[in-house]
UniProtKB/Swiss-Prot annotation:
Family per record: Belongs to the purine/pyrimidine phosphoribosyltransferase family. Archaeal HPRT subfamily.
GO cellular component: a single term: cytoplasm
Compartments reported by the entry: Cytoplasm
Pathway participation: Purine metabolism; IMP biosynthesis via salvage pathway; IMP from hypoxanthine: step 1/1
Species this protein is from: Methanosarcina mazei (strain ATCC BAA-159 / DSM 3647 / Goe1 / Go1 / JCM 11833 / OCM 88) (Methanosarcina frisia)
PROSITE patterns referenced in this protein's UniProt entry, alphabetically: PUR_PYR_PR_TRANSFER
Reactions performed catalytically: IMP + diphosphate = hypoxanthine + 5-phospho-alpha-D-ribose 1-diphosphate; GMP + diphosphate = guanine + 5-phospho-alpha-D-ribose 1-diphosphate
Designated name of the protein: Hypoxanthine/guanine phosphoribosyltransferase
Record note on quaternary structure: Homodimer.
Gene name of this polypeptide: hpt
Gene Ontology biological process terms, A to Z: IMP salvage; purine ribonucleoside salvage
Amino acid sequence: MLERLKDSLIRSPIIKRGEYNYFIHPISDGVPSIDPHLVEEISDYISEIADMNVDTILTVEAMGIPVANALSLKTGIPLTIVRKRPYFLEGEVELSQSTGYSKGVLYINGLKKGDRIIIVDDVISTGGTLLALVRALQTIGVEVMDVISVIGRGDGYLKLRELGVEPKILVTIDVGEKGVEIKDVFGNQ
């Protein structure tokens, strides 16, 4: 179950940014090259465990796009990308997001009250981006049927529970100076 993903995470190089051990991985960074078989493994697994009775697959640019696009191609469900710049379209929703290492503004277009969506993201660590996104979607009246993160690090996912959302994290990791340790795999009971 998710063997390519687990193996690739364990082999991830680690760099130090201040006191933070940062892992470099194709799914979270696009470096090194993104293996299409890895993306296929991930999208296949998501299609099995997620509520796919939705109108749209939603992801935040940039690194959620490869997996969300593969899932869209596999299921035939349209893909909507939350962008980091405005397009000034009617109905565009602006939201501020803050993570442990950055702050920014995101823009949602093309969604309306009553839409049913699944959110697919590459990594959840602090939970800041997904928390702001889910709040904005709930304000619009969009039904968040599922939240999927390929990789989880830390306990930022707990913040989503405050909004009634229980994210599914495919692989939960811990990152130390010596490397990535797999802590849990979704569905591995």
